[in-house]
């Protein structure tokens, strides 16, 4: 609960600063990289979260690890360290993404199929989904052989289940 509140407050402030400096996309990309590292690297997560590691050490580490980032992104990360909020990075990034997606009219769509669709099929699906939603689609494909054939599309809270598995289950229930 606290992480979500802190994340929202900081994400809104950071987005506003990024927007004023015309750095919204750059910061979006940087925060995604930081988030992936935070989720996937235990040492990084431990360093960020550990209360006994001094702020200056954390800032030095961030500047070294993310040296390819532009100064603006590094300054934002160091600001989060200074305010003892880097450990809330998941909430900050999640909220920043929500703001970014809303303002840029982007929607995440998860599509699950029994087999990997071709690039042509993916392009056609994206085109149809963009027409349906009126937004740019960020498509994530998942493979699950248990659905037999067809597909399951998840757009936010809406699920469109056109799988053969669901149809068979419906027939079996009678």
From Swiss-Prot:
InterPro entries with a match to the protein in the record: ATP_synth_OSCP/delta_N_sf, ATPase_OSCP/d_CS, ATPase_OSCP/dsu
Question: SUPFAM superfamilies in the record, alphabetically?
Answer: N-terminal domain of the delta subunit of the F1F0-ATP synthase (SSF47928)
Q: Name one GO cellular component term.
A: plasma membrane
Check the record and name the Pfam families matching this protein: OSCP
Q: Where are the transmembrane segments?
A: none
* Localization terms from the record: Cell inner membrane
Superkingdom per UniProt: Bacteria
Its primary localisation, in coarse terms, equals: membrane
Q: Which UniProt keywords apply?
A: ATP synthesis, Cell inner membrane, Cell membrane, CF(1), Hydrogen ion transport, Ion transport, Membrane, Sodium, Sodium transport, Transport
Q: How does it sit in the membrane?
A: Peripheral membrane protein
- Can you tell me which family this protein belongs to? Belongs to the ATPase delta chain family.
Cite the HAMAP family for this sequence: ATP_synth_delta_bact
- What else does UniProt say about it? The ATPase of I.tartaricus is of special interest because it uses sodium ions instead of protons as the physiological coupling ion.
Quaternary structure, from the entry: F-type ATPases have 2 components, F(1) - the catalytic core - and F(0) - the membrane proton channel. F(1) has five subunits: alpha(3), beta(3), gamma(1), delta(1), epsilon(1). F(0) has three main subunits: a(1), b(2) and c(10-14). The alpha and beta chains form an alternating ring which encloses part of the gamma chain. F(1) is attached to F(0) by a central stalk formed by the gamma and epsilon chains, while a peripheral stalk is formed by the delta and b chains.
Q: What does this protein do?
A: F(1)F(0) ATP synthase produces ATP from ADP in the presence of a proton or sodium gradient. F-type ATPases consist of two structural domains, F(1) containing the extramembraneous catalytic core and F(0) containing the membrane proton channel, linked together by a central stalk and a peripheral stalk. During catalysis, ATP synthesis in the catalytic domain of F(1) is coupled via a rotary mechanism of the central stalk subunits to proton translocation.
Official protein name in the record: ATP synthase subunit delta, sodium ion specific
Q: Which organism is it from?
A: Ilyobacter tartaricus
**Species lineage:** Bacteria, Fusobacteriati, Fusobacteriota, Fusobacteriia, Fusobacteriales
Q: Which gene encodes it?
A: atpH
């Amino acid at each position: 609960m606290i992480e979500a509140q802190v994340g929202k407050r900081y994400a809104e402030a950071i987005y506003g600063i990024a927007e004023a400096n015309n750095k919204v996309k750059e910061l979006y990309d940087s925060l995604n990289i930081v988030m992936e590292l935070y989720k996937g690297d235990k040492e990084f997560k431990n360093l960020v979260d550990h209360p006994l590691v001094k702020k200056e050490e954390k800032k030095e580490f961030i500047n070294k690890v993310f040296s390819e980032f532009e100064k603006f992104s590094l300054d934002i990360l160091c600001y989060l360290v200074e305010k003892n909020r880097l450990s809330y990075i998941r909430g900050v990034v999640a909220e920043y993404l929500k703001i970014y997606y809303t303002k840029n009219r982007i929607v995440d769509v998860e599509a699950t199929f029994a087999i990997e669709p071709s690039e042509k099929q993916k392009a056609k699906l994206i085109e149809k989904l963009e027409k349906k939603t009126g937004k740019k689609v960020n498509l994530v494909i998942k493979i699950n052989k248990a659905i037999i054939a067809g597909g399951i599309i998840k757009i936010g809270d809406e699920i469109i289940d056109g799988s053969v598995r669901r149809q068979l289950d419906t027939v079996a229930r009678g």
